Amino acid sequence: MFLGAAMAQVSLCMIVRDEAELLPRCLASVKDQVDELIVLDTGSRDRTPAIATEAGAKLLHTDWADDFSAARNQAIAAATGDWILVLDADEELILEAWTELRSQLDQPEALAFTVLREETQAGQVPYSRLSRLFRNRPDIRFQRPYHELVDDSLLALQQQEPNWRITAWPTPVIRHYGYGRDRLQQRGTAERMRQSLETWLADHPEDAYLCSKLGGLLVQEGDLKAAQRWLKQGLKQGRPEPAVRYELLYHLALLERRQGDLDAAIDRYQAALQEPVDAIHKLGAWVNLSHLYRDRGQLGLAYDAARQAVAAAPQATVALTALGLAARAIGNYPEAIAAYQQALQLDPNDPSLYQNLGAVLFQVGQLEASYAAFRQAIAGYEQQGSPEAQRLELRLQAMGIRL
């Protein structure tokens, strides 16, 4: 199943528990892409262990001690490959990017690669950068019980041996689709995560990174008062590294938007955009800033921000959607239509894209094309079981349109 070429060997290391629903998708994405699969199960009661074994994994077991770093480190200690790749069950490899990245692993000075992870759930920063691919060495280990990182180990090793290089890979390598609020609540994950982060931060209040993670979780959960406290505490910790400061400002902007303070939210996004992080990392701020400007009637600024979003991530449907909305708002209908059509080439299963396209086509008098797009939107919503299908039909009927 796994690769056997005379190149650097890669061990995929995972920790899992009751992931029978998600694990097959993850394992399908790594089929023939890694040389060894280590799966540490922390107490599953479903078919997770069987699924891992059927995929050819070396299956390990441990009791859960409420410490992700301890479990991660136990898994990677069992690996025999030259490199460690870390994935969760709700993630998958983006094959084209991974293939290119893997070809770089034979570089003798390469210590680790930080990779972009694409977030598919609304409310998350669209892209995050993580150290998920690193050499298999006993002095590279995870730290922190929650939102665990190997970064401190990597930096310490690099300081001791300056010849080592840590490379920021420019394109997304991992897609993450499992942090939806419904899923978090269904599994009780959000409350456990909150408790663990609060316990850690009570002893380590200077940890701006985990202040950001806890604040972002609380914004998602709707506890805005507590979220504001942690996010502002994170900003007070000297000057956090740019990626952490960006996320602190980003989540504060989301919070202030939900509080109705548009001016403050705009200021936060503008401050976030000043941070020296990857252009693609700024996608969320540009998109949300475009929507805020459009809500305030500042249509030119909304359009400019949307163009910046597309420049940052040309293949991101969220950026193209923002451009479609902004272009339509200023009367640039051809560009709006082109943006939605390009987005549909990237994601032909998103009914909202058909709906938006149908609205612009209707506005410019291309009625048959408009009706076809609306039919696609309704069919897509129905396939998802979304009530938006009926709502769209009723709105169209109110306009005298019967499809």
Swiss-Prot record:
Is Repeat set as a keyword in this record? yes
Superkingdom of the source species: Bacteria
Keywords from UniProt, A to Z, are:
Repeat, TPR repeat
The protein's matches in Gene3D superfamilies, at most eight in alphabetical order, are given as:
Spore Coat Polysaccharide Biosynthesis Protein SpsA, Chain A (3.90.550.10), Tetratricopeptide repeat domain (1.25.40.10)
Q: What SMART domains does the record tag this protein with?
A: TPR
Chain positions of TPR repeats: 208-243, 244-282, 283-316, 317-350, 351-387
Q: Which residues form the signal peptide?
A: none
Pfam (any one): TPR_8
SUPFAM superfamilies, alphabetized: Nucleotide-diphospho-sugar transferases, TPR-like
Q: What is this protein called?
A: TPR repeat-containing protein Synpcc7942_0270
